[in-house]
Structures are given as C-alpha cells and as structure tokens.
C-alpha cells in the first residue's frame, strides 16, 4: 500500500497530506544528510545510564539542521498554493532574519530549551522536526545498528528523548516483540510487550481498542494512567501506518474515549462541536491549503 492509496481511502487527510507534500518537498531541497559519527566510544557511558543521544556530551553539530529549517520556512513563506501556511511561515521567517543566532536557537528550542520563544511555535515544531528527522536519518540508522536494543528498554526515545507516538508489533507469538516509534525523529526502539511506556505499569496485557478496516492499526492504552499508543499490528505498510499523521483519526477516537496522548505531537487535534459535520471530512487549522475545518493542523 502506498501513501496515496491510504489518503485516497481516508479523504479527510487530504488537506494535511497536501501540506506535508509541500513541506517534504522543501525539506528535500534544503536539508543535506548530517554525517554519521566516526565512533561511539564517547557515548558508551551516557548510553548506559539512559541519556538520549542528542542530549549527551558527544559532539554532534546540529546547527546545519537549524540553517535548513530557516531555508524551509523561507520557502514555505513564498508558497502561493497555501496562503495560510505561507502567512505563518512569513512571520517566522521575519523573526529569523532579525536574529543571526536563529539557527542555533531553533535547534536548542526543538530539544527543549525554552529560553527563546518563536512567534509560531506549532508550525516551527512541525517543520523543525520534519526537517531534522530527514537530516538525522543516516545518524539514526548508524545508531540503531550500533546499539543493543536489550540495553535500552526505556520508555523514551534513545535519540531525542521523546515519548513514543506509535508502536509496532513484530513477529509471531510466543516470540513477538514490540517496538516503539518516536513521532519527532522517527527512531524505533524495543520495549516490553505488556508495560505501559508512560507510567511504566506492568500488566498481563494492555487494553486495546480495535478499529475495523484500518490496516491493522489499533489503540493500546493503560488502564492505570489512561495514556495510549497507536499500534500497528502488521507487516509491509510501516512507512505509511507508522507516520503518526496518517492515523490522526485514531487520536480523535482515543480522545472521545477519555484517553490521553502522552507523546508530543507535530499536529493539533481540535475539538468538534456536537452539531458539527463528522470530524473525518476535513482537516485544517493554521496550515490548511483551502478551507478551515476541525480535525488537525500544524499548530
């Protein structure tokens, strides 16, 4: 199944898919791959005590990623096809042009430094992490090959430290394994089959909400903390079904059931009034291309 096939069968994702295509095209032009590390010896100690790679003492120059984010935002600001997106991007671009330290501030802010405040924080969070994830791909692949998954059975991302947005069940019982996936940098890591990745409660099994006709996607949630993770129970469509934004309707379903999204999101889910049209007919917000609706936006 391709991404186009999925969007074609989930037409409410169309506006967000259009925005993602424009962002992805701008990122492809602006973000060169960051080089992988020459060695991992300096990270061994931090890894052993649970320090995520991008928060460790190992020297990783992410400032080129900050410069790439500036270029992507500048490109989006001049996109006539998405005027609302262009307007928000133009506000960010003006802020960047007035600050020669903007590339460094962007990277620090994406990693959790609140000393600086962007004028369109949601848009920068979305575009910033989409851009950084593209540049970090070779590093993430090398990191995955180097580390022993059995030594990182932690609830947060080994690369950037975020809580998981998705999970993937791999293999068959009794040896089936669960891998968590970061919604920011797209890293994957192994975690226990039955533990909650948010409050770390252990139970015989997590509660689940199945969704018919959704390609093996379901919602797994913890009855103790009510946190949930969207889970793909299948093989072959990982690039589509583990993308987070392609299953935002499951986030709405979870919200309707009183469950909590613990992971950070690059998209905002907006409440729908009881007399409004069904929430899966449009997607919108600050970064819409045509009409404003009620499902999701780049904040």
Language model feature labels by segment:
Residues 1-55, 231-299:
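Long, contiguous alpha-helical scaffold regions
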Residues 1-144, 289:
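N-terminal alpha-helical interaction blocks
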Residues 100-101, 123-130, 163-170, 257-259, ...:
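Short N-terminal helix-initiation segments at or just after the protein's N-terminus
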Residues 138-258:
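Cys/His-clustered metal-coordination modules, chiefly Zn-binding fingers
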């Amino acid at each position: 199944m391709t991404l186009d096939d999925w969007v074609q069968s989930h037409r409410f994702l169309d506006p967000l898919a259009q925005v993602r295509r424009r962002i992805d095209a701008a990122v492809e032009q602006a973000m060169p791959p960051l080089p992988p590390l020459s060695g991992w010896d300096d990270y061994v100690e931090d890894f052993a005590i649970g320090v995520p790679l991008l928060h460790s003492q190992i020297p990783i120059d992410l400032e080129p990623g900050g410069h790439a984010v500036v270029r992507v935002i500048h490109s989006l600001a001049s996109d006539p096809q998405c005027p609302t997106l262009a307007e928000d991007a133009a506000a960010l671009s003006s802020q960047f042009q007035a600050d020669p330290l903007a590339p460094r501030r962007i990277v620090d802010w994406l990693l959790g430094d609140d000393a600086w405040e962007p004028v369109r924080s949601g848009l920068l969070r979305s575009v910033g992490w989409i851009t950084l994830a593209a540049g970090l791909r070779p590093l993430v692949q090398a990191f995955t090959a180097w580390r022993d998954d059995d030594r990182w059975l932690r609830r947060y991302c080994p690369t950037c430290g975020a809580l998981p947005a998705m999970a993937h069940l791999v293999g068959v019982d009794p040896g089936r394994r669960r891998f968590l996936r970061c919604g920011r940098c797209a890293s994957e890591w192994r975690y226990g089959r039955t533990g909650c990745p948010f409050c770390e409660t252990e139970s015989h099994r997590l509660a689940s909400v199945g969704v018919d006709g959704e390609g093996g996607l379901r919602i797994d949630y913890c009855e103790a903390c009510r946190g949930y993770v969207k889970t793909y129970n299948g093989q072959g469509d990982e690039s589509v079904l583990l993308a987070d934004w392609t299953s935002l309707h499951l986030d709405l379903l979870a919200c309707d059931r009183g469950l909590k999204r613990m992971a950070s999101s690059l998209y905002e889910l907006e409440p729908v009034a009881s007399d409004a049209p069904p929430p899966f007919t449009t997607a919108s917000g600050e970064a819409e291309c045509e009409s404003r609706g009620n499902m999701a936006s780049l904040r």
